[in-house]
Amino acid sequence: MNQELNKKLVKTIGEVKWYNIRRCYGYIAGEDGEDAFIHKNDLPFWTIFLKPGDRVEYTKEFTKKGIKAKNLTII
């Protein structure tokens, strides 16, 4: 089942709800109405300074814990 979840990747657009640089994580509100978790380890170096309202494109990864954002770029 774990392998099935990781194979389901969907590219989408959203807006940063919040990102805490000290805690190294935050959330994105997807245009599809689904929030996605984002962690510093999944961000390119130049995007670690995300701020609320930044529009981003990312790939949603469906995990047992919920949706995780990967391959994020600011648009």
Where are these regions (language model features)?
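Short aromatic-glycine-enriched beta-strand elements
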Residues: 22-28
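A short macromolecule-binding patch
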Residues: 34-41
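Short boundary/loop segments of OB/S1/cold-shock single-stranded nucleic-acid-binding domains
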Residues: 1-12
